[in-house]
Structure formats: structure tokens, C-alpha cells
Amino acid sequence: MDKTTNGVAAYYSRFGSWAGYNMVLGRSQHAGYWTSETKNEQQAQANFLRMFAKELQLKPTDRVLDAGSGQGVMARHLVQANGSEVIGITITPREVKISEKLSRHMTPAPRFVLGDYSHTDFPDEYFDVVYVNETLSHAKDMQATMQEFYRILKPGGRVVFADYEVDARHMSARQQRMMDFLEQHAGGFGVRQQNPGEISQALQQAGFADISETDWTEAVMPTYHRLRSLARPFAWIQPDAKLAPFFVNAVMASHGYSTLYEAGLFRYLLYKGTKPLAHRAK
């Protein structure tokens, strides 16, 4: 494993990370989707699963890649909802084991593999859909990642991402230290490649067409604000403090996306793109 793979796997294998996701987000590793009728995080997470599944528009015959599958929450939901063939890929060995354990009662069940979704062993034109839920910040080379998604998609295949953009180009020195912290301690090697417009630009340069962005910011921010509130006792720990590496998620919640949103430097978007039908693998 290289530095990038080790850094991401180490973050998600850390007790404070996976235990926090389990207790606070119900094993999900993404924000919830809040409406005027949503009362709690559990409902928001269920909303997110439904909303994202609706946007995917899967057919039972589709072969689907969950790129950065975490503990397999979305993969299991999609198999149950659509009957599609879903393969989850993660570079964290622990997540493969947990995902397989949580899916063993299912028929059919999603399949999980260990690997880096930026450099896979899948054949050309293998998948109908590739989706991502908040893991592009771990992609060290965003352009290479989009090229890989393009390679493994069939002509007419689609990408759907629920992820954020951060305007790192206009951050203060203090905010830049938070970006440094994400890279050093949370595997955020791609976060500075998520400036406004950069993900869509990477999709376009990879060859995708019909690229769209839908703003989900206001629907997901209650989760980020909630995480910030829960981390308030740790707000005094700055990202460059010696104690910070021992409280990674708390520091991220205190000084990360909620505060960047208030500064106008954070948006959460649903990205879509299609591989043209005319393409044929070289």
C-alpha cells in the first residue's frame, strides 16, 4: 500500500472513527438528508438512502460499483430496493469484513472487495453505474479517478456522486491548516481538488457528457451542524495542536465543514455524468 491507501485505511480503522460513525450516524459515513418533517438523524439517514436511490434510477439488471463503500449501508439498501448487482470497493480491510458480516443474511447480497477505486482490476466496460458517497476527498488524483470510472463503465453508463466542494483557493491561513489536518490525519488527499467546478471539470476531461450539478447543501447541513454541536467540548483543540491527532473526528466536526459553510466556502452537490454511447474501449 502507498501513503494514500495507508492514510485512508488507517483513518477508517481507528476506533474513534468507526465507533463514531456507528453511534452518531448509524454506520453511515455520509450526511443525512433533512426535510421540514425530519425529526432526527436516523430519519435523515433513511431519507438520504431513499433520495440517492431515486437519483440512481437503477434497474434489476444493472451492475453497480459503490466506490468507497464503507460499511456497506448504501449497497445493502440498493440490493434490497432494486435487486441490482452491487459491488462495493474499499481500501480498508476492516470495512470489507464488517460489510460481509452485515450482508451475510441477504439473498441476493452485495459483494465487497478490497482495493483502490482509483486503480481497479475490473475489466473495461464492466459496470452500468458507478456511484460515490462522500469519498472523493480520499482520491489523491481526481482526474485519474474519473478516467478509471470512465474506463470501467459501459457506453451509456452513468456516474452519480453525492459529495462536497470546498473553496480552498479562498481560505484563510487558519482554514488552510484545517485542510492540512484532513490530509495528514483523515486521508483527505483529494480535498484541495474539490474547489468549485473542479469535479465537473474532471468528469468532462475524462470524456463524460450530460454533466449536471444539483445543490443539496441546505438538505444536508443539519447533520454537519449537529456534529459540530456534539463536538463542542473539543472545540478548543485547534487542528495544529499536539492533541488534535487524538481527536480527529471531533476536530473535523468543530473546525471543518460547518464552519466552512458559514464562511461561504462549502457546498454539497449531487453530480451526474454519462459515458457517451459512441465510445468503444481502445
Feature-to-residue mapping (PLM):
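Short alpha-helix
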Residues: V191-G207
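N-terminal auxiliary segments of SAM/dcSAM-dependent transferases
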Residues: M1-Y21
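Short, glycine-/aromatic-enriched active-site segment of Class I SAM-dependent methyltransferases
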Residues: E165-G190
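C-terminal lobe and adjacent flexible extensions of AdoMet/dcAdoMet transferase-like proteins
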Residues: V248-K282
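A short acidic, Gly/Pro-enriched loop at the edge of an enzyme's catalytic core
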Residues: S118-V129
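A short glycine-rich, Lys/Arg-flanked "PGG" loop and its adjoining helix->strand segment in the class I
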Residues: Q143-R158
